[in-house]
Amino acid sequence: MGGPTPQPMGEASGSVAPLLKEDGKAFKIAVLIPTINNADELDIVLGRLAKQSYSHFEVIISDSKSKDHTKDVCEKYGATWIEDPSRNRADACNFALRQMDHDLVLFTDDDTVPPLDWVEKLVRWFDNPEVGAVGGPNFAPDDDPFGAKCADVAFCTKFMTAGTRYGAQPKGELVPITHNPGVNCAHRMANLREVDFFEPGCIGAEDVVLDAKIQRAGHKLFIDPSNVMPHRRRRPFKPYMKQMRNYGYTRMVANKRWPEISAWSHTAIGFFPVIVVTALLAMLYGGLTGGADADLWFSLSGEWDISRVAFHIPLGLICIYIAISWLGAAIGTSPHRSIGTVFLAPLFVFLAQWAYGQGVIKAWREIRRTGGRAGEGAQIDDRIRTA
């Protein structure tokens, strides 16, 4: 996107001086947002970007052939609209990135509520040449419904999250990190070009793969724990579980190609649905064969035959699971912790792990079929894809 320098996006033009490069020229900055059929929420995002304290940036929308009024929303706020033929976030971003000539690229999604100092707080760190990329945490916005806040608490629980990075808030101003979610991050364009941008055809976990590529090239990633991006959570129950199935599926397939992003917990969670079904069948057997008799409750005395073991051991493990979920939610990082959301955390953690495990199982089948090649399969999501 050569040619004339774009007009500042923010209404408060000049409220913060532009960030300068070593040669004294201002960094050319863009916010890149991939979108599809989500014009109303995109309107909120662009409205917030139009009021940023740092106004020296361009907004670029990579639109995968939306059938709603997305283009009109872009024109309303003066954002650059690009019609993109792809069906996944990685390819949508790549399509735009290959046309851009900016120095810094900030990434977010079309369902966020950017704070009015979000751009300022991200770009300020790039006066340090050691910073290759920087990001921040993301939580559900305050106006999300109760169910979405329950999902946020489950995502940000201290335990039970299968290695996810939601809500990470390490201590310090700028902390080294191995991954920043693509909803709240900024990269140097030179580094993006060096690694040839996102992995083509990556149907999910594309931000994790990108960060792995950038670190392979020797560049450093950081997180600013104070720069929080409110990001809408999927509502229970179908959209929430569909998203979690997609996370499990796409992460495991990506892990096959990029071993350095793999964690043992990603594989372990694939056995969760099998363990749950086995435990319930054991309890059913134990209950039907006398293992749940009244005199066997709240006592360790007496004979522990197979019926008693089959009923009470799984029941005890369920109680421990609930207790760990409660504890993890209570000491987690979500700002939406309350008596209600913490109380329901075991349910939301269970649903997330069940769905994530289903996604992992689907990924195992995909890997056996294709070897986990990029561009194979299709993501599981709740968007209407018209590209």
Predicted region positions:
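A conserved acidic beta->alpha catalytic loop
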Residues: 48, 55, 63-71, 112
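Conserved donor NDP-sugar-binding/catalytic core segment of glycosyltransferases
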Residues: 117-153, 228
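Catalytic donor/gating beta->alpha subdomain of glycosyltransferases that bind UDP-sugars
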Residues: 199-262
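Short aromatic/hydrophobic "clamp" motif used to bind/position activated sugar donors
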Residues: 105
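Glycine-rich, basic loop-to-helix element that forms the pyrophosphate-binding segment
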Residues: 84-100, 171, 175
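Short, flexible, basic/aromatic active-site loop/helix in glycosyltransferases
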Residues: 136-142, 154-177, 257
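Membrane-embedded multi-pass helical conduit in multi-pass membrane proteins
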Residues: 272-369
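N-proximal low-complexity "stem/linker" segments adjacent to membrane-targeting elements
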Residues: 1-48
